[in-house]
């Protein structure tokens, strides 16, 4: 209770400080908005596009030049909305550009060519904010902006936490940013950066996981990106749950700019600018170092140790006159924590301790070359690696420490990808690609929870394996109102020759003004982690075998139908119904076992597995959103779903992520403070989340005592349900523009009411008892940011 009161006290002090900031200012400041207008399909510049700032008086605007570039100067600071129009193209609406005096606004706008039949006149269409950046997506796609990631309460500038506001998506109640989509395991998520698959981009990420407590990729580096929750376009493979397709923004290529942030989670610095004045090349670099130790010292958090992490990311863009455009991107992170658990009788006596270290790195090169005005080719080479290692120590009967668990997992990859895109005309576009991944691994794990020196060796292998993927997309716009996207994805895991041929189809039909009916179907599959294929199974006679080397691919067929209604220019309604049939799912090779690998959130299994499982997910999702307009927005999402698996024993049970329902309500408003200069803004945002608790398996106390380790009662596999989870997040921010800088102070509090729902139970090896695990408690984060 003492820690909780300290958190509340700090939050109230920070809130009071925000509300009492400020001297008046009568000076109005201005900034430049500039960018490039290109064809969405061919990526060629659009000449003569008209760009206006909506509701400006007098009207402010300009037109794009021969290279598609535009510039609007002397734009007053604040929020603005852009309208982009060009003869022969759909209008493009770009809302909520935050114009600050400390940083230019640089954007790239992609426009879609109109399909006009002979005799048609006065065709007008507008692409809105919620539509996917990927023109091949017809259903279950949502674009997320960096501005939303920063604005939504409780996100901590983490895009993985931000997408939990979308219908059908929830995060881990225990504090991690694991993404559960439509009842599927977070392991089914695909992370992509700059068009290429990357490993889990989170700090403190365990083997086989897709999430973590802190994202290593700072949102200050991101451009608008896509998130997909089902029936993915043909170019996406090696995923059955969801796809996070992230794009890095391009640094300012005309002037140097700097951003500094300091908060409870970390201190970071971003710099960007041109390599040479008058040239079009640019760089963007961000470095961050953790500051959680401060909160730990204040007693505001208790991790049984101080988490330490640092990360760096960069994006270098080098256009050339005749050889196309080159870009180099990278992400690196290092994290670790030394945890100690002390005796209840003595605060100086350590009963157990663990040292957990992780690292990740990605470096890639993209080369895009325009073959014609309608076709381009993109080549990518990327190298990536991750390591997670840990030593967990306990005391034996004599009070001496022994190594109870030792892990060391190293995974590397080299990826080569080639993508060809051809916009044949306004109706037809073809996109095809080939991806080869060379996987390297050196993995080791052993455990002995009793301390007798008799270790169980569950992992000990090293080697290489290949993964081949290919795809073909065809987009056919039969009419302006009717679009078909068809294609096929192919995947072959060369380690055991498991392969999958995956047809995909999407349809988008505009019923009338602002009304769209869409449909998507497709087959999807995913390769398990190498640690699952090479896991060693210990037999009763003490011998080992590796029975999972020939394990096949887990597969899923997705069926989605959606309806979208643009109620007003600023509000829309979206509904989707879906059914997913999962098959070829890995389950324990025992007719009496209920075990299903897809119920795991991370890690691997040292059981003998076979592809005899199946499952089904179905549900209904509803979204009502009022875009940010006139300093106000709200978002309401709701999901009803059911997620079940059938193991080798033939019994259908809840999946481990079958919470059955999820809902979100987000609301926010900005207030101009003081005079008409609009240089000072107070923002207030809130988010309320309520979702069903996940099923869990109870522990067998006597068996756990005998093994000195948590032993689950498999006779009650996933039969208990965790408490429903209520979580309220709140943020308040104060932004002030000065002549050449923008300052912002923000307080962001997760679980402001400190609700404590029971999420799971675990065996405590120190107290030899079964304990309950609860949702993440209140967590305040204060952030100061300056742009100059």
Identify the function of each model-found stretch.
Residues 303, 324-370, 377-378, 385-412, ...:
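Flexible loop and strand-edge segments within Gram-negative outer membrane beta-barrel domains
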Residues 579-581, 601-693:
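Gram-negative outer-membrane beta-barrel transporters
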Residues 263-289, 302-336, 355-383, 424-432:
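Transmembrane beta-barrel wall of Gram-negative outer-membrane proteins
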Residues 634, 677, 687-711, 723-729, ...:
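C-terminal beta-signal and adjacent terminal beta-strands/loops
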Residues 409, 413-417, 458-471, 548, ...:
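Outer membrane beta-barrel strand-and-loop segments of large Gram-negative receptors
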Residues 98-106, 124-232, 243, 249:
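Periplasmic N-terminal accessory/gating domains of Gram-negative outer-membrane beta-barrel systems
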Residues 24-120, 126:
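Periplasm-facing N-terminal accessory domains of Gram-negative outer-membrane beta-barrel systems
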Residues 201-202, 336, 387, 445-449, ...:
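Surface-exposed extracellular loop regions of Gram-negative outer-membrane beta-barrel proteins
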């Amino acid at each position: 209770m003492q820690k909780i009161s300290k958190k509340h006290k700090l939050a109230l002090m920070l809130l009071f400080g925000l509300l009492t900031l400020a001297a008046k200012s009568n000076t109005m400041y201005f900034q430049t908005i500039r960018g490039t207008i290109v064809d969405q399909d061919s990526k060629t510049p659009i000449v003569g596009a008209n760009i206006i700032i909506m509701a400006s008086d007098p009207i402010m605007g300009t037109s794009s030049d021969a290279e598609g570039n535009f510039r609007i100067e002397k734009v007053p600071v604040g929020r603005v909305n852009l309208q982009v129009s060009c003869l022969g193209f759909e209008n493009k609406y770009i809302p909520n550009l935050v114009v600050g005096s400390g940083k230019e606004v640089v954007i790239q706008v992609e426009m879609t060519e109109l399909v006009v039949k002979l005799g048609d006149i006065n065709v007008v269409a507008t692409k809105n904010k919620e539509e996917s950046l990927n023109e091949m997506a017809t259903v279950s796609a949502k674009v997320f902006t960096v501005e939303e990631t920063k604005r939504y309460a409780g996100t901590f500038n983490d895009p993985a936490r931000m997408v939990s506001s979308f219908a059908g998506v929830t995060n881990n109640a225990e504090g991690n940013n694991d993404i559960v989509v439509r009842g599927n395991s977070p392991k089914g998520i695909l992370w992509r950066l700059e068009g290429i698959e990357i490993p889990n981009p989170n700090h403190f990420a365990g083997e086989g996981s897709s999430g973590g407590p802190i994202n290593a990729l700072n949102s200050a580096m991101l451009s608008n990106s896509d998130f997909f929750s089902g029936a993915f376009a043909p170019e996406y493979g090696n995923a059955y749950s969801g796809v996070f397709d992230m794009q890095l923004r391009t640094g300012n290529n005309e002037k140097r700019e700097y951003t500094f942030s300091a908060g409870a989670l970390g201190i970071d610095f971003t710099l960007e600018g041109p390599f040479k004045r008058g040239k079009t090349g640019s760089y963007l670099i961000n470095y961050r170092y953790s500051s959680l130790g401060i909160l730990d010292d204040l007693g505001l958090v208790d991790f049984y140790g101080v988490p330490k992490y640092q990360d760096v990311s960069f994006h270098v863009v080098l256009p050339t006159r005749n050889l196309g455009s080159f870009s180099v991107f990278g992400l690196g992170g290092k994290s670790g924590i030394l945890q100690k658990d002390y005796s209840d009788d003595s605060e100086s006596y350590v009963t157990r301790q663990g040292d957990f270290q992780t690292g990740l790195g990605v470096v890639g090169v993209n080369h895009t070359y325009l073959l014609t005005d309608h076709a381009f080719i993109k080549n990518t080479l990327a190298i990536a690696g991750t390591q997670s290692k840990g030593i967990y120590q306990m005391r034996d009967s004599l009070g001496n420490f022994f190594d109870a668990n030792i892990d060391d997992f190293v995974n590397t990859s080299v990826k080569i990808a080639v993508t060809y895109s051809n916009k044949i005309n306004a109706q037809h576009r073809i996109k095809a690609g080939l991806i080869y991944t060379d996987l390297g691994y050196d993995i080791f794990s052993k455990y002995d929870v009793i301390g007798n020196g008799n270790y169980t060796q569950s992992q000990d292998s090293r080697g290489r394996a290949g993964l081949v993927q290919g795809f073909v997309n065809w987009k056919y716009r039969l009419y302006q109102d009717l679009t078909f996207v068809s294609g096929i994805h192919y995947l072959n895991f060369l380690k055991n020759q498991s392969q999958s041929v995956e047809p995909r189809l999407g349809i988008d039909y505009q019923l009338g003004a602002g009304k769209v009916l869409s449909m998507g179907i497709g087959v999807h599959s995913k390769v398990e982690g190498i640690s699952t294929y090479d896991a060693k199974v210990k037999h009763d006679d003490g011998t080992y075998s590796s029975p999972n080397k020939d394990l096949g691919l887990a597969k899923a067929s997705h069926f989605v139908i959606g309806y979208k209604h643009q109620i007003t220019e600023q509000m829309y309604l979206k509904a989707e119904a879906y059914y997913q049939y999962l098959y070829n799912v890995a389950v324990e090779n025992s007719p009496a076992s209920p075990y299903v690998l897809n119920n795991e959130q991370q890690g691997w299994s040292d059981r003998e597995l076979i592809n005899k499982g199946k499952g089904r997910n179905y549900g209904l999702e509803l979204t009502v959103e009022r875009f940010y307009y006139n300093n106000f927005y709200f978002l309401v999402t709701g999901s009803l779903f059911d997620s079940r698996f059938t193991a080798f024993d033939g019994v259908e049970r809840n999946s481990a992520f079958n919470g059955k329902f999820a809902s979100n309500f987000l609301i926010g408003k900005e207030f101009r403070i003081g005079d008409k200069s609009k240089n000072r803004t107070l923002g207030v945002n809130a988010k309320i989340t309520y979702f069903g608790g996940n099923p869990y398996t109870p522990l067998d106390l006597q068996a756990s005592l005998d093994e000195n380790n948590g032993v689950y009662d498999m006779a009650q596999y996933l039969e208990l349900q965790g408490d429903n989870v209520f979580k309220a997040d709140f943020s308040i921010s104060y932004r002030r523009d000065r002549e050449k800088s923008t300052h912002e102070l923000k307080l962001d509090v997760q679980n402001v009411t400190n609700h404590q729902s029971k999420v799971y139970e675990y065996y405590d090896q120190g107290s030899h008892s079964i304990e309950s695990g609860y949702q993440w408690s209140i967590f305040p984060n204060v952030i100061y940011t300056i742009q100059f």
